[in-house]
Amino acid sequence: LPGQKILVANRPEIEFPMVVPQHVTPCGPVMRPAPSVAEVDPELDAWLRRGPTVFISLGTHRFMDEDEAVEMAEVVRRVLDADDERKSEDVGGVRGRLQVLWKLKKVETDQNYGSLKQYVGKDFGTEPGGRIHGVLGEALDSDRVRVVDWVKPQPSAVLQTGQVVCSIHHGGANSFNDALTYVKHYPRRLLKKVCVCVGGVIY
């Protein structure tokens, strides 16, 4: 309708140069409320409260084959080893031993990614004898690392627990803004010696 105001969830400072019509108001990120982790998944809430958590969530549409998942597992292993060497009682102001929640969406191995079929009832490597377990065995067995195909609460709710000290994501606007808003001490150096390229995004 003529003269009607339109709010857009963006900022001119991060957009491509353009003329913004007078009836359009960039208002920045719109943060939607979400049910708490305690409401949606009390068991996960209790697990998160054990200690500072790295949350790996690469979005709904980013799938990994086994080689990529093993590469990420190796990064996780190095981060946990570095944390153990520090022997600190807290990370980013959160007390406890560093742990990892990793939402992993899997595909069948296909070099050309011609067919992105999601695994159904088949797991590659989180069980003993698999390649991921070979990298993260003790951490998986002790539940220090959780690898899941879906997290029931909204990602923003996981971040709002205050237990997440590092958010590894696919670079989407919601994930980026959620991490900046809810992660207390957003670490920019935790993975400084590790470079992982997943789907064009470098962590």
Identify the role of each PLM range:
Residues 141-151:
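Active-site donor-binding acidic/aromatic loop of nucleotide-activated sugar
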Residues 2, 50, 160-163:
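Alpha-helix C-terminal capping/helix-to-coil transition sites in glycosyltransferase folds
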Residues 16-135:
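Conserved catalytic-core segment of nucleotide-activated headgroup transferases in glycan assembly
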Residues 151-202:
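A donor-sugar binding/catalytic signature common to diverse glycosyltransferases
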Residues 2-4, 96-98, 184-185:
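A short helix->loop->beta-strand "cap" motif at the edges of active sites that frequently abuts
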Residues 1-23, 195-200:
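Active-site-proximal region of nucleotide-activated glycan assembly enzymes
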Residues 7-9, 27, 148:
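Hydrophobic residues at beta-strand termini and immediately following loops
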